[in-house]
Design a protein with these regions (language model features):
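Bacterial N-terminal signal peptides
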Residues: 7-18
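Boundary at the C-terminal end of the N-terminal hydrophobic targeting segment
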Residues: 21-23
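N-terminal low-complexity, Pro/Thr/Ser-rich intrinsically disordered segments
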Residues: 25-51
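Positively charged n-region of N-terminal signal peptides that target proteins for export
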Residues: 1-6
Length: 201
C-alpha cells in the first residue's frame, strides 16, 4: 500500500517551495512599496491570501503564532455587531499575522465571542484527528527550527506529534533528493501544524 502520509508531506513541501519562490520574487519589486495592501492584492487574478482559524482563546493562539513561531501582527481589531440569533451585541476580535510576505501565507485568528469567556464556544471539545479528511494542515518552512522548537514545544496548549527529524523525498524530475527536517504538532485549538526546515548542505 502506498505511503499516503509520506506522499502528502511531499506535496506540502512542494507547495511550500513554490510559496517561498513566489514570496522572494514579489517582495523584491520596488514598485510595490507605493501601493496599499488592497491595491497589491488586486494585482493578481487569483490569490490564496489568507487562512483564517476560528479559535477559542486568541491570546493562547498568539503565544504560539506570534511569540513562538515569530509571525508578525499586521492587523488587530475588535468588531461589534448585533448577534445573529441572540438579543445582545456580539464582539469579535480579528487578527492577521504575516510570515515573510504580506500577501502569501498570512494567518488569520478570529474569536467570535471575544469578551464572553463563559460562552460555550470557548469550551468546545478540541479535535485532534491527525491526517484524516476534513482536517487542514498548516505547513511552515523556517531556517530556525532548532532555535524555535523548544519554545514551541513548551507553549501551553501545544501537543507534540513528532519532534524534528530528517526525512528524504525524491527530487524534482529525477534531480537530487530533497532532505527536510520535519516537526509536527497541534496548536491550542487542535489545528495540525508542520514546521519544517529544508536541509541545504
Amino acid at each position: 500500500m502506498p505511503n499516503l502520509k509520506g506522499f502528502f508531506l511531499l506535496l506540502c513541501t512542494t507547495i511550500a517551495f513554490t510559496s517561498t519562490a513566489f514570496a522572494a520574487h514579489h517582495s523584491s519589486d520596488d514598485g510595490e512599496s507605493a501601493l496599499s495592501p488592497i491595491e497589491k492584492a488586486a494585482e493578481y487574478p487569483l490569490l490564496l491570501r489568507r487562512t483564517t482559524l476560528i479559535v477559542r482563546d486568541i491570546e493562547a493562539s498568539l503565544a504560539l503564532y506570534e511569540a513562538a513561531l515569530g509571525m508578525e501582527i499586521i492587523y488587530d481589531e475588535q468588531i461589534a455587531r448585533p448577534h445573529a440569533s441572540e438579543d445582545r451585541e456580539q464582539r469579535l476580535r480579528l487578527i492577521f499575522l504575516r510570515a515573510s510576505h504580506d500577501h502569501v501565507g498570512v494567518i488569520g485568528l478570529i474569536d467570535y465571542e471575544y469578551g464572553y469567556p463563559e460562552h460555550p464556544a470557548h469550551s468546545k471539545p478540541i479535535r485532534q484527528e491527525g491526517f484524516t479528511p476534513g482536517n487542514p494542515i498548516l505547513l511552515f518552512n523556517t531556517q530556525e527550527l532548532n532555535t524555535r522548537w523548544p519554545t514551541i514545544a513548551a507553549t501551553p496548549g501545544v501537543k507534540v506529534v513528532k519532534a524534528p527529524g530528517l526525512r528524504t523525498y525524491p527530487g524534482y524530475d529525477g534531480g537530487p533528493d530533497i532532505k527536510v527536517m520535519v516537526s509536527i504538532f497541534y496548536d491550542p485549538d487542535g489545528y495540525l501544524i508542520e514546521l519544517n526546515q529544508i536541509v541545504t548542505e
